[in-house]
Amino acid sequence: MGKLIKLITTLTVLVSLLQYCCEFNSGSISCERTQTLCHYTNPRVWNTYFSRNCELYKNKVSPGFDIVARKYDTAVKPVIDDATVKVNKVAIQPAFKVIHSQCKKWNCGKYYQLVRSPMVKTRRFFFAKYNAFVKPNIDKFFTAEFRSHLKERILKCKNIGHYYFTITSRCIKSKYDFIVGNTEEKLMGKFKNKDTHGIHGSVTHEPSSEDMVLTVSTMESDEEELTTTSTQTVVETITLDQEEASAVANHAHDDEASTDVEDSTDVNVNEQALLQEDFDMWSETILQKTQDVIQLFEKDVSKYIHGKLVEEANHFKAKFQSLDDKSKKFFSKISLAINDIECVEGIDSETGKKIFFDKSGSTEISQYITRELVREYFNETRSTLDELTNAMEKDLSEITDEIEKKVNAIREENVEVFEEWGDIIVNEWSKRMAYVDVINAHMGADDDTTLDEEKAKSSVNWKKFLKGKKQIIESRDKLAHHSADLSRVNAFRQKVQKKILSFTQESGEFLYILRSKANLQFQERERKERERKEREKAAAEEFQRQQELLLQQEEEDEEDVSYTSTSTITTTTTMTL
């Protein structure tokens, strides 16, 4: 069981690689065997075949296969194509140039046998494995019944081609036989009048089934030779006299007229039968064409969207990088301002003005940090980041609108292609049916019953024609309203919007943290300023109180001095008395 799984996996990989090579080199494959191998290993070919011949497969498996094929065309194939181009450009071409330049210097003749021997062994090994495991399964699949069915299909296509060729040749004949017939009759009359002893001329009859030439020539005055040649390469020679030759010529004209009537009847029958068969194929052709146009539309849309999103992804990557750099500059500016809130005041020795230093006192700052200044920094940061994010959202909306317009343009282009194809098909079928009606009117049978049957068939065919025309119109409407796969566009838009929202939230949270930190710094500075002012106020009050005490003490000292002086004067006066 494990070997069978490995074999199936190997065959799947080989078939996938083969199909990719066939599709990549579709315009440069000249070998018929390679083209046949590419055709019969294409899963889409077998899907179409089984859908037409197996109702269960058509209802159960084919829809899933179409979905997988569409996903492959839209999601996997563009990635593989880009990877192939990149690998070819980055690795294969440079390596080939290097190898080619080195091989010019080598004498590879002596290495030929060394390389050829392992390759021969490998080829024999693969052939042995193929004959042992793969070929029996292929022989079981390609049975006699399948081959006979395939042969019938090919013969049917061949008959249809032969039918169209016959119709074309008859159209040409119907236009020019009347002129040729009149010319032959005039020439025969002239020859009869001029030569009473012999007949010189030719009678040509071209029925649809075979080409026959009846030639009458006069060899002698008493003898004639009549030679009849057909496509069976049978030659009959008859010797007639003059009167018998004339009778044969007249009989040839009668045979031609009767044969034309029979051929017209055959044409009428074959036309009706083939027309009824082709109507069934017409419906399948319309469905297949509709499916092909839808696949082409989805492929073009996928290719355009892939290239557009890759381009815009690079642009938005640069925009997000610029947004991140600008936000870091604003945040750094605010952080420095917050750190400088706790600054140190000083006096310039030269000018005597106040100057400010950072909290370490080593670096001078440009200005004193206030609440109004920090609030201005926050508002500038918030407004700038909002402008940048709004511009990115606007660009994203414009890109989405541009993609939708381009998708609609691609859809309209494919619808126009289908309309042109439908107009040509309808015109060709209307001409063909009108041609069949003309044949029925002028070359129909004399029997009334047969005429009624032909009229009934013509009515049925015209109804089928109208049904096919309505089917084309419905298919056109289906193409016009077929929704494109914009899932990658929506995913890209959601991804960018999510990233913008994430950046907005992160920047808002960081600004909130910085604002809280700034408030704490300002509150701490204000607290210290209040304490300093209280200390200064207390020191001033203490100084004033000390001054008052000193003044009071001085006043008391002055009063003591005045009292001592008065006492001395009084004592002196008393003693004098």
UniProtKB/Swiss-Prot annotation:
GO terms for cellular component: mitochondrion; ribonucleoprotein complex. The keyword Coiled coil applies. It is found in: Mitochondrion. Residues 1-23 form the signal peptide. Residues 525-545 have a biased composition (Basic and acidic residues). Keywords: Coiled coil, Mitochondrion, Ribonucleoprotein, Signal, Sporulation. It comes from the Eukaryota. The keyword Coiled coil applies. Residues 379-416, 513-561 form a coiled coil. Residues 562-577 have a biased composition (Low complexity). Residues 525-577 are annotated as: Disordered. One of its GO terms (biological process) is sporulation resulting in formation of a cellular spore. Disulfide bonds: none annotated. Involved in spore wall assembly. May be a component of the mitochondrial RNase MRP (MtMRP), a ribonucleoprotein endoribonuclease involved in the cleaving RNA transcripts to generate primers for DNA replication in mitochondria. Belongs to the SHE10 family. This is Outer spore wall assembly protein SHE10. It comes from Saccharomyces cerevisiae (strain RM11-1a).
